């Protein structure tokens, strides 16, 4: 990383740490005054169906204190199906819903079943880094549900994004081809470690969101409280995210996406999480807030206090980039003059 960029990042982190020490207090005062305090729960609950309460009730949740956001997302991507892809036959008997709530609805609702099958197909194509053709997705949906394909594709895309942090993007409208793109650059296609597994990007974005909303620094207790709402427990291997403690305190820390440190002067020792340098480099507060908003089926500005901070962060990034470009241009001009001067003396 260039020296100028490092110094800019260091300066921004110092400002964030200073701001974070007072943000919880300031946020409480602001939200108490405006009566818009948001007591949030995990936006990503893995279960059997996508549950959604009325829009009116969701709006009221943002206005009343001590109320969690009304909209939660539950995704069941269980499957047991053989199908033919572009050039290969993929046979799978696996379930993402082990130990979760009942999948009775997913077994009786044909649209949910087709959505789950399409999610499995998309995940296989993502792991193999193969292009995705609309014709192949239609084979998964089959003729009986061809008319429902747009709705099924929309739901499958949503599930891929909020659970795994992977976006489905159309790359060629003439050939109806798509590609899956991770929201961040975690190694091994998002699985972090080599071998079998699923992308951890969605979980990382959730953790970054908690840290941001807790004043840019979240205690370990608050992180586990949040993860428990996602049915992810300390010491219990998760069917998608693996061993959670190792993932969040070792793997993501080693990769510099998270910082895990002891709370100053704590006795007995307590620990807290912050954004790591790679998180600052690969995403932003606004992008994380947009992710949370999408999961909760709302808009970033619904999180008013954090939205305003995210806007300030975006402005700081633009200014830092402009300063870096100005510095690079000045250095380039200086080098050009030096070369011209040496040539004239030759």
UniProtKB/Swiss-Prot annotation:
Which PROSITE patterns does its entry note? Answer: MAGE (PS50838)
Q: Which gene encodes it?
A: MAGEB3
PANTHER family in the record, alphabetically?
MELANOMA-ASSOCIATED ANTIGEN B3, MELANOMA-ASSOCIATED ANTIGEN MAGE ANTIGEN
Looking up Pfam families in the UniProt record yields:
MAGE, MAGE_N
Q: Which GO terms describe its biological process?
A: negative regulation of transcription by RNA polymerase II
Cellular component per GO, a single term: nucleus
Which tissues is it found in, per the record? Answer: Expressed in testis.
Spans annotated as Disordered = 1-35
- Recorded source organism is Homo sapiens
What keywords appear on the UniProt entry?
Answer: Tumor antigen
What InterPro entries has UniProt attached to this entry?
MAGE, MAGE_N, MAGE_WH1, MAGE_WH2, MHD_dom
Taxonomy, superkingdom: Eukaryota
- Write the protein's name: Melanoma-associated antigen B3
MAGE domain spans which residues?
111-310
What residue spans carry the Polar residues bias annotation? 18-33
């Amino acid at each position: 990383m260039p020296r100028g960029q490092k110094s800019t990042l260091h300066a921004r982190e110092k400002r964030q740490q200073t701001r974070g020490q007072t943000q919880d207090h300031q946020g409480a005062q602001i939200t108490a005054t405006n009566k818009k305090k948001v007591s949030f729960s995990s936006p990503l609950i893995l279960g059997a169906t996508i549950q959604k309460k009325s829009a009116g009730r969701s709006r009221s949740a943002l206005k009343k204190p001590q109320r969690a956001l009304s909209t939660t997302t539950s995704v069941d991507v269980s499957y047991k199906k053989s199908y033919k892809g572009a050039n290969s036959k993929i046979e799978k008997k696996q379930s993402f819903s082990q130990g979760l709530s009942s999948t009775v609805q997913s077994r009786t609702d044909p649209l949910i079943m087709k959505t789950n099958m399409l999610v499995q197909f998309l995940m296989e194509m993502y792991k193999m880094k193969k292009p995705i053709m609309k014709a192949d997705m239609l084979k998964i949906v089959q003729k009986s549900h061809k008319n429902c394909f747009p709705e099924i594709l929309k739901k499958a895309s949503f599930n891929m994004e909020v659970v795994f942090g992977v976006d489905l993007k159309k790359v060629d409208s003439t050939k109806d081809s798509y590609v899956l793109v991770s929201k961040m650059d975690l190694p091994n296609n998002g699985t972090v470690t080599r071998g079998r597994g699923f992308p951890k990007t969605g979980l990382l974005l959730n953790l970054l969101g908690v840290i941001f909303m807790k004043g840019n620094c979240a205690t370990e207790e608050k992180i586990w409280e949040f993860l428990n709402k996602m049915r992810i427990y300390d010491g219990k291997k998760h069917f998608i995210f693996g061993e959670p403690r190792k993932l969040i305190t070792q793997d993501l820390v080693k990769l510099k996406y998270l910082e895990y440190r002891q709370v100053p002067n704590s006795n007995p020792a307590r620990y807290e999480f912050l954004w790591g340098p790679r998180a600052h480099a690969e995403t932003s507060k606004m992008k994380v807030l947009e992710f949370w908003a999408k999961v909760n089926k709302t808009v970033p500005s619904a999180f008013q206090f954090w939205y305003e901070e995210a806007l300030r962060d975006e402005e700081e990034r633009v200014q830092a980039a402009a300063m870096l470009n100005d510095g690079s241009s000045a250095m380039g001009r200086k080098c050009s003059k030096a070369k011209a001067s040496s040539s004239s003396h030759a």
